[in-house]
């Protein structure tokens, strides 16, 4: 059926945030200070520590943070993580319901049960955040993650562990590492794996000591012949790195995968800050036990604040194949990614890496690290890539947090999931951005499909798509604006951003148009994923790709934002999108993955069999032609590993 009426505006929208650029003088002074300290030959972790650390015999003891029980329907903002020296881990601190409401929505068990995903990775219960140390080893994909075994809120962080043959179906293993040493007493935090040429595995991770100092530690498999890597040994000489002079005790975390230098040494980078300037410290090592702090920084950007979960890797300029982290040369670009502690988004820049100068230089300073491009313009943070030597590709994982209330998370007993793993490669058509795309293996979950060819959507119309259910979907769609509309539409200097536009209800001559997902029949709840096109003064089209959650739920204790950004659409290309819908998660990819948006959606009516999918066109002038293929998606097999009696239980 077709509704010939435009989408209605909503009452309020979240205001966008911005970061202020600071003077570079402080950074230069800080660099001079750091350089003077290492000029004599480099700081070595085996020397005298420059941060106060308590030994294993210290009497200093601190209790673990325990999950908070919320027995009533009253809920209040609670900060988690900041006091310990990491980014805010509670969405409650960021909002208090619409209109400042402190009463939680009366969620029932049916609603909360529906929110749990069916083919995204998550533990059986409790809290999860950053992906850690992903790798392919002896026939298994290994995935480690930040995990609280004691509740559905951040705290008591250890390393969870799971394995898979295809990164879709997962088997949970026993915890890999727990907080049992003085140097990680307050948490076994984020880390990365490096596989050496001889097959040896090196795992570096951040530990929060019994005095909340962030230090770097070394671990390795107890039995390298074990394909499941069940047991891990922590190096007896931990910590191998402590904060250098001038760096705060809580501003030194998340070591990267190591890469080989031209001198044959291994090199890592670690995120930090000087005042409000984000920086990446660089260390060289030959044995992963003793390190040299290199003079200068890999990159520093004023105004970006603390850099978490730094990632650094090469991409090919010629094809889509992945590259080992150590590859460099004329046919290679490098990608530097940082997770900004201040706004909890993942930013990346593409540029060149000088091995001798230990310096990354972005191709476009306007798209520098932390101020330009993002991996994902929705809820996607603390991401980590790895080189998959099994299929010659680079794989990206990202943490998808919750945007409901902590009360609801505690009630349902779990919080957070991981994104569907994505392949990452350079967009060789533009040369200025990455392409992200769900791994091919996810297509093994496709069931029956419905195809819709050349559907016409007139201005201000909503068209129902007749499919079975709309809770677990893989949708591929293409859209075209009729030529007559493009030619007669006046050129405009209209300013448009997804986050401040008013959402899908904001009508323009050439947009918005796209899909309404997780919608109920009466459209009291719906989430638009759409394109908005502006014809500029020179006749060129400027396209934005957005996801609008402002009418996604009737609940008052969920965050309803509008996400998105500009997406390049090249001459001759149709507007294209792909969506993975998995209950409360919608992952959207525009133009082959040039721009990606992940949303958390918590409907109260558009659930189970009541969920619908619609085509919509809220433009005032353009008629849109759409062609879609919609697959129902099966559930992934995610369960505990079926150990034999002689295996670890």
Curated annotation (Swiss-Prot):
Biased composition (Polar residues): 54-72
Domain of life of the source: Eukaryota
Membrane topology note: Single-pass type II membrane protein
Key words of the record: Disulfide bond, Glycoprotein, Glycosidase, Hydrolase, Membrane, Signal-anchor, Transmembrane, Transmembrane helix, Vacuole, Zymogen
Transmembrane stretches, start-end: 23-43
Pfam families named among the record's database cross-references: Glyco_hydro_32C, Glyco_hydro_32N, INV_N
Catalytic activity, EC: 3.2.1.26
Propeptide: 1-101
Disulfide bond residue pairs: 498-546
All ranges on the Cytoplasmic side of the membrane: 1-22
Alphabetical GO biological process terms: sucrose metabolic process
Region Disordered, residue ranges: 52-75
Parts of the chain on the Lumenal side: 44-649
Glycosylation sites: 210, 275, 618
Binding of substrate, residues: 127-130, 146, 154, 189-190, 253-254, 308, 341
UniProt keyword Hydrolase present: yes
Induction, as annotated: Regulation of synthesis appears to be related to the growth of seedlings.
Record InterPro entries: Beta-fructofuranosidase_N (IPR021792), ConA-like_dom_sf (IPR013320), Fructan_Metab_Enzymes (IPR050551), Glyco_hydro_32 (IPR001362), Glyco_hydro_32_AS (IPR018053), Glyco_hydro_32_C (IPR013189), Glyco_hydro_32_N (IPR013148), Glyco_hydro_beta-prop_sf (IPR023296)
Entry-linked Gene3D superfamilies: Exo-inulinase, domain 1, Glycosyl hydrolase domain, family 43
GO cellular component term of the entry, any: vacuolar lumen
Annotated active site: 130
Its biological purpose: Possible role in the continued mobilization of sucrose to sink organs.
Family that this chain belongs to: Belongs to the glycosyl hydrolase 32 family.
Name the UniProt record assigns to this protein: Acid beta-fructofuranosidase
Origin organism lineage: Eukaryota, Viridiplantae, Streptophyta, Embryophyta, Tracheophyta
């Amino acid at each position: 059926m077709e509704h010939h009426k435009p989408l209605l505006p909503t009452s309020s929208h979240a205001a966008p945030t911005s970061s202020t650029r600071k003077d570079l003088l402080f950074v230069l002074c800080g660099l001079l200070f750091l350089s003077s300290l290492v000029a004599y030959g480099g700081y070595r972790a085996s020397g005298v520590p420059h941060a106060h650390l308590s030994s294993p015999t210290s009497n200093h003891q601190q209790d673990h943070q325990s999950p908070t029980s919320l027995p009533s329907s009253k809920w209040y903002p609670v900060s988690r993580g900041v006091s310990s020296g990491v980014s805010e881990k509670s969405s409650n601190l960021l909002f208090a319901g619409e209109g400042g409401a402190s009463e939680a929505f009366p969620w029932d068990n049916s609603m909360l049960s529906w929110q749990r995903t069916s083919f995204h990775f998550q533990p059986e219960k409790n809290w999860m955040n950053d992906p850690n140390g992903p790798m392919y080893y002896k026939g298994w994909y290994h995935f480690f993650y930040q995990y609280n075994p004691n509740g559905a809120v951040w705290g008591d962080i250890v390393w969870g562990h799971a394995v898979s043959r295809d990164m879709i179906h997962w088997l949970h293993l026993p915890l890999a590492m727990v907080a049992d040493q003085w140097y990680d007493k307050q948490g076994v935090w984020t880390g990365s794996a490096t596989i050496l040429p001889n097959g040896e595995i090196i795992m570096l991770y951040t530990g929060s000591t019994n005095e909340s100092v962030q230090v770097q530690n070394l671990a390795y498999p107890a039995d390298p012949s074990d394909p499941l890597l069940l047991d891990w040994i922590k190096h007896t000489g931990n910590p191998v790195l402590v904060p250098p002079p001038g760096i705060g005790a809580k501003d030194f975390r998340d070591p990267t995968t190591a890469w080989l230098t031209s001198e044959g040494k291994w090199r890592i980078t670690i995120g930090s800050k000087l005042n409000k300037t984000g920086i990446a410290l660089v260390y060289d090592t030959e044995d992963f036990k003793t390190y040299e702090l290199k003079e200068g920084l890999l990159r520093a950007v004023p105004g970006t604040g603390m850099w978490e979960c730094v990632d650094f890797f090469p991409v090919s300029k010629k094809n889509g194949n992945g590259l080992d982290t150590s590859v460099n040369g004329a046919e290679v670009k490098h990608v530097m990614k940082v997770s900004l502690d201040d706004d909890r988004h993942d930013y990346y820049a593409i540029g060149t890496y000088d091995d001798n100068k230990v310096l990354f230089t972005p191709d476009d300073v306007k798209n520098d690290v932390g101020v330009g491009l993002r991996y994902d313009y929705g809820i996607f943070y603390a991401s980590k890539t790895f080189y998959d030597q099994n299929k010659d590709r680079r794989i990206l994982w990202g943490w998808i947090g919750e945007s409901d209330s902590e009360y609801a998370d505690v009630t349902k007993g779990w919080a957070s999931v991981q994104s569907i793993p994505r392949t990452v490669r350079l967009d060789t058509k533009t040369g200025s951005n990455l392409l992200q795309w769900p791994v091919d293996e996810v297509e093994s979950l496709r069931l029956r499909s419905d195809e819709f060819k050349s559907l016409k959507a007139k201005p201000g119309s909503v068209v129902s798509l007749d499919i079975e259910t709309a809770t677990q979907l893989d949708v591929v769609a293409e859209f075209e604006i009729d030529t007559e509309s493009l030619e007669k539409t006046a050129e405009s200097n209209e300013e448009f951003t997804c986050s401040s536009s008013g959402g899908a209800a904001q009508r323009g001559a050439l947009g918005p148009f796209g899909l309404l997902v997780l919608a109920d029949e009466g459209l009291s709840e719906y989430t638009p994923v759409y394109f908005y096109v502006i014809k500029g003064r020179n006749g060129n089209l400027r396209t934005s790709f957005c996801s609008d959650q402002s009418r996604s739920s009737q609940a008052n204790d969920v965050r309803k934002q509008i996400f998105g950004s500009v997406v390049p659409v090249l001459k001759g290309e149709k507007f294209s999108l792909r969506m993975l819908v998995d209950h409360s998660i919608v992952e959207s990819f525009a133009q082959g993955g040039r721009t990606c948006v992940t949303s958390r959606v918590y409907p109260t009516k558009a659930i189970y069999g009541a969920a619908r999918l619609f085509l919509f066109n809220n433009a005032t002038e353009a008629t849109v032609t759409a062609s879609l293929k919609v697959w129902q998606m099966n559930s992934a097999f995610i369960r505990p590993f079926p150990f034999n009696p002689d295996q670890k239980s």
